[in-house]
Amino acid sequence: MSLDDPVVITCSISGVIANREQCPAIPYTPEEYGAEARRAVEEGASMIHIHARKPDGTPSYEIEDFSAITEAIRGAVDDVIVNYSTGTIGVPVAKRVEYLRACRPEVAALNMGSMNYAKYSRSRKDFVFQMVFSNPFEEIVELLKAMNELGIKPEHECFDVGHVGSLEPLMDMGVLKAPLHVDCVMGVVGGIPPTPRNLAAMVDNILDIPTEGANPGGVGGGRGHHWGVIGISRDQWTLIAAALTLGGSIRAGVEDNLYLPDGTMARSNGDLIAQARRMTEDVGRRPATVAEARGLLGIA
């Protein structure tokens, strides 16, 4: 990747932790997902990252909910890359593979390691929530094999430098092929602190991964793997600025952060994607079209 490449802007459309009491823009029903996807795509998003919910807002891992949401999104926009979450606590791998097999998204997230996962409140001097996010290698490999069988591109979500280091052994095993699509997730307590220097360190490690055969025919062909940043909470905007100047892609949406840089709560995912697009253009880059995004990700 380079500064000459267009920017893949992903919209994290819903998440499963926040709710409408915190932000009215969070979609619950398939129709609301479709409307939010349309707003995001109109502002420059080329990929939509989905956590499924039931119409009452409850997180769901059921085929019918993923299917209904995906159908609503595809009915609302001409074209967009659909990306499913597979990150859960307490949901068996087989259950996650079921909805991947039934719905066949182009991309699916794959968390690259286990960690403490928490949110800390300085005012309370305590954790708002804390959990162990378990992603052992045996589960990573099982999900990778399923994605390979189904023709789904894995999005490797790395919460620390050590997670990046877990990629090369999987390539050596033959279950992971170049070009890689890697996102640096920053801002979760228990993961790497959300600073531009730490992002640069993660990117250096990504770029050290062998790229033989990576992306020979796509946009940016021959320049290696695709990477981006996922900034959690209000550090998101600083990290987006850093990623754009380092040549990476970006993600925004109500899953990650509810607020614009001035502290105003977003009225929709479209507000957040519009801000991300303006920042992209302000550094002399441009949003990727959906076709260009597929090329950069190696799924064209």
Language model feature labels by segment:
Residues Y120-R122, P261-E281:
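C-terminal helical cap(s) of enzyme catalytic domains, especially alpha/beta-barrels
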Residues S60-S134:
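Active-site beta->alpha loop and helix N-cap motifs at the rims of alpha/beta catalytic domains
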Residues E21, M47-F66, V185-M186, G190, ...:
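Glycine-rich, proline-tolerant flexible connector loops at the mouths of alpha/beta enzymes
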Residues V107-V254:
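Catalytic alpha/beta core domains of metabolic enzymes, predominantly
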Residues Y33, A40, H51, A108, ...:
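Conserved, mostly hydrophobic/aromatic
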Residues M1-A25, S114-F127:
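N-terminal small/glycine-rich loop or linker at the start of catalytic domains
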Residues P59-Y84, L143, M202-P210, G222, ...:
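Alpha-helix-loop-beta-strand connector modules within alpha/beta enzyme cores
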Residues G15-E32, T86-V93, F129-S134, G191, ...:
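Active-site mouth loops of central-metabolism enzymes
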